[in-house]
UniProtKB/Swiss-Prot annotation:
InterPro entries: IGPD_sf, ImidazoleglycerolP_deHydtase, ImidazoleglycerP_deHydtase_CS, Ribosomal_Su5_D2-typ_SF. Its EC number is 4.2.1.19. It comes from Rhodospirillum rubrum (strain ATCC 11170 / ATH 1.1.1 / DSM 467 / LMG 4362 / NCIMB 8255 / S1). This is Imidazoleglycerol-phosphate dehydratase. Keywords: Amino-acid biosynthesis, Cytoplasm, Histidine biosynthesis, Lyase. It is found in: Cytoplasm. It catalyses: D-erythro-1-(imidazol-4-yl)glycerol 3-phosphate = 3-(imidazol-4-yl)-2-oxopropyl phosphate + H2O. Its main location: cytoplasm.
Length: 199
């Protein structure tokens, strides 16, 4: 069973995450940030990862700490659930439209975190959430999930559609990457024999 539970507690946030990579896309998400909840629900539904996230943070200041720490906690849980990463496909990509917006995401579950973010917004906020925080979430997730992550929005006008296409594309790419390859179920997908470290 590729499941994990992570609890993260600081002076700024308290977060508990449970996930199952081999789920059916069931979710229970409560971060105190409505738009972030909506995006995490998309990740669960479209990756088929079962996900429970409960977070309390200093949202009376702003949403930065809760957004970033939620990304860190989910990424850490993914790393734990993947274990030694034997048998995974490792790579995944998705090109996802949402109405007028089109976004491409490519991932490598290499255990070498890196983010390329080619996404621009025409507004500073979506609802009460600063649009700059979406990059912060992806950065935090990539760091603790050990994923090389490229996110490129090709075009779009509606900022909600742009962001949602990013999260949905991430979900689809992750679903491909962490699927088990039945021909190599006991092998690490690297000529080095391990995933991580330097090239």
């Amino acid at each position: 069973m590729r499941q994990a539970t992570v609890t993260r507690a600081t002076k700024e946030t308290e977060i508990t995450v449970w996930l199952d990579l081999d789920g059916t896309g069931q979710y229970e998400v409560s971060t105190g940030i409505g738009f972030l909840d909506h995006m995490l629900e998309q990740v669960s539904r479209h990756s088929l990862m079962d996900l429970r996230v409960h977070a309390k943070g200093d949202t009376h200041i702003d949403f930065h700490h809760t957004t970033e720490d939620t990304g860190l906690a989910i990424g850490q849980a993914v790393t734990q659930a993947l274990g030694d990463r034997k048998g995974i496909q490792r790579y995944g990509s998705a090109l996802i439209p949402m109405d007028e917006a089109l976004t491409q995401v490519a991932v490598d579950l290499s255990n070498r975190p890196y983010l390329i973010w080619k996404v621009d917004f025409s507004r500073d906020k979506l609802g009460d959430m600063d649009t700059e925080l979406f990059k912060e979430w992806f950065q935090a997730f990539s760091q603790t999930a050990g994923v090389t992550l490229h996110v490129a929005n090709h075009y779009g006008e509606n900022n909600h559609h742009i962001v949602e296409s990013c999260y949905k594309a991430l979900a689809r790419a992750l679903r491909q990457a962490w699927e088990i390859d039945p021909r190599k179920a006991d092998a690490v997908p690297s000529t080095k024999g391990v995933l991580g470290g330097t090239l």
